[in-house]
Regions:
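A cross-kingdom feature marking solvent-exposed beta-strand/loop segments within repeated
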Residues: 88-103, 109-111, 128-131
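A generic structural motif
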Residues: 41-46, 100-106
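Regulatory modules associated with amino-acid/nitrogen control
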Residues: 1-88, 112-131
Length: 131
């Protein structure tokens, strides 16, 4: 089965906050965001268009979405994608949801990531017009 990944047109920033930080309500009005919290800190991935006062931030990430549906019985999807990108020395930031996986790569490595994935037989949708 040939996997399809869609490239989101937005760029994203990964923010770091203290574990007890209160996020602005505007965060929750965004179309897409991801929050992770541990005892050490709170991480937020959100569109770079939203400026936030975080402890640290890493801007310039592009996002691949693995198009599904993906069942919990499907194994190795993230491993295969990350392995393909690792072979090309492309760092990733991976996020999984109940429905699918998201793989973020730095903007300056996006073209290389697309080429590497296509070479391995992945179908890449690069604009909403292709959906």
């Amino acid at each position: 089965m040939r996997m399809t990944l869609a490239v989101h047109p937005e760029q994203y920033t990964i923010h770091s906050f203290s574990p007890n930080a209160v996020l602005p309500s505007e965060v929750f009005a965004q179309d897409m965001y991801f929050i992770g919290k541990t005892q050490e800190g709170l991480s937020l991935v959100i569109s770079s268009e939203m400026e936030l006062d975080s402890l640290e931030q890493e801007p310039g990430w592009c996002c691949f979405e693995v198009l599904g549906p993906l069942g919990f019985s499907m194994t190795g999807i993230l491993s295969k994608v990350s392995g393909t990108l690792a072979d090309e020395q492309i760092s990733i930031f991976a996020i999984s949801t109940f429905d699918t996986d998201y793989i973020l790569v730095k903007n300056n490595r996006l073209k290389s990531a697309i080429a590497a994935l296509k070479k391995q037989g992945y179908h890449i949708i690069e604009s909403k017009d292709e959906v």
